[in-house]
Amino acid sequence: MSRPSTPLLDKAPTPDRLRALPEQDLPQLAEELRTELIDAVSTTGGHLGAGLGVVELTVALHHVFNTPYDRIIWDVGHQAYPHKILTGRRDRIRTLRQAGGLSGFTKRAESEYDPFGAAHSSTSISAGLGMAVASELSGEKRNVIAVIGDGSMSAGMAYEAMNNAGALDARLIVILNDNDMSIAPPTGAMSAYLARLVSGRTYRSVREAAKQVAQKLPKFLQDKARKSEEYARAFFTGGTLFEELGFYYVGPIDGHNLDHLLPVLKNVRDTQKGPVLIHVVTQKGKGYAPAEAAADKYHGVNKFDVITGKQAKPPANVPSYTKIFGTSLIEEARHDDKIVAVTAAMPTGTGLDLFGEAFPKRVFDVGIAEQHAVTFAAGLASEGYKPFCAIYSTFLQRGYDQVVHDVSIQNLPVRFPIDRAGLVGADGPTHAGSFDTGFLAALPGFVVMAASDEAELRHMVRTAAEYDEGPISFRYPRGDGVGVDLPERGSVLEIGKGRIVREGTKVALLSFGTRLQECLAAAEELGAAGLSTTVADARFAKPLDHDLIRRLAREHEVLVMVEEGAVGGFGSHVLQFLATDGLLDRGLKVRALTLPDIYQDHGKPDAMYAEAGLDRTGIVRTVFAALHRDELGHEALPTPFRA
């Protein structure tokens, strides 16, 4: 299939070439960029809607500002695909999120045009402020621009940064990309005119002169003059909140109209003082009818047909872990009206959209605010409710102090369903669920579980619902289950007790999480090599099943712990117990298989687990090495001594 014709885009592979184009060519360039983006993402999948919404803004920014000397920071990074195309990466744009290809987010190691990496929300203003202050300290004259969506503005970190920027009076430009029209819609030509007016030097010079005059007036007249000016500007343009934080507010303006964007950006670029916020209103999915009609479905997409918009989805023979969690929680909530659910802006991603349909008054979406979500859940628990605070593993990191201080220390029974545990593939290291076992199992009194399959997940939902002695968590991966039979309702598991799923005599494989299937496959191969193998499902990283571990250690020559987490997690806790209990004193060969002590780049999950040695082959190889056997399982002969 031939690619679309893009003559202007072909002439502007980098921002310096883009800046050489006349302004009248920029609308056509934007259309070609949009066409290229749609075609590229149709072949790779990825985040489409947000990028389509900032095409004109991206063109305008790189045309007005001297990148990469001037810094542009894209919050989250979902909207950065057009930026990548315009900054020398067009030839690799069809490798997005593929192994060895471009990251789906901004990444410092990838390009000098990515001054700050991102993937989690609401970091851009803080990073931009740090860069702006560094520029001032160095005597530089560079511009620093942070582009942040209205969704990301729901996080407290954004306001902390703005409050600090206003106090420092730093020269920082924040562009609020309002793509849900959730703050204020543009008001047409009058809005554009006012935006140009108030962003210009003349207006700001007159304003500063008026302030100087006002300072000579009595205090009560100074206050009246200030309030009158603020009221007049707020009446026409909005932005009172941002002004109170110390920002000079400009907008709202149409983010798809280059005639509106360019003069405002130039005016702000040429301003030499203080933080400025430009309120730009855009439309997610702009210029592609299917994405405009269903923005939620085109936020993140699989490969799709450009003509029809139909996404290619592999047939699912079994339900996803996320869906199993959602349906299991609904079942428990039917039996217990104290069960409530909390999500931090991820109802669909966590399966709580299903719960919300069944119990709309018992689900709470608190926005991108994981810290608040955790403490809000703690408050619910303190009043006798049973909150399930469902957060991705990678995002739970953002609320860890609240987990410790507000939940764990007070021993409040908050339930933490932890989705996206382990590796997540195309989203790479920023979204990998590597650390939750380590940082939760370190907390006194915290119950930490991991589901080995979808039936176990159903049991753990029931167990968490019934457990009122303190905080409890259960982790599960992205993707579909393994196809085991599901009970109609989960059973209550005995806290701190695992299970034997295969009996053997020589080797013991102790799995925590969904690597259990790989352990069973490895046991088959080891058995074929004459090594009788036990496979156990730990279920709990805390409290550990001491009786099970003692049995495995005493009755086997080799013990291998396997988990989908970083060093310092389940395996470390088992080793600590083995050492303390004296179980290492008799020559037991122990190995702990974890994710490697690196941030693994994006790729296919199966390939990434193989790289980590957490697949069947890696487990078998580890056992053979412990027993001094070669890759075929034969006992290695000692190297002959030579004088």
UniProtKB/Swiss-Prot annotation:
Keyword Magnesium: yes
Gene3D superfamilies, A to Z: 3.40.50.920, 3.40.50.970
One MF term in the entry's GO annotations: 1-deoxy-D-xylulose-5-phosphate synthase activity
Keywords, comma-separated and alphabetical: Isoprene biosynthesis, Magnesium, Metal-binding, Thiamine biosynthesis, Thiamine pyrophosphate, Transferase
Cofactor requirements of the protein: Mg(2+); thiamine diphosphate
A Pfam family annotated for this UniProt entry: DXP_synthase_N
Name of the protein: 1-deoxy-D-xylulose-5-phosphate synthase
Subunit description: Homodimer.
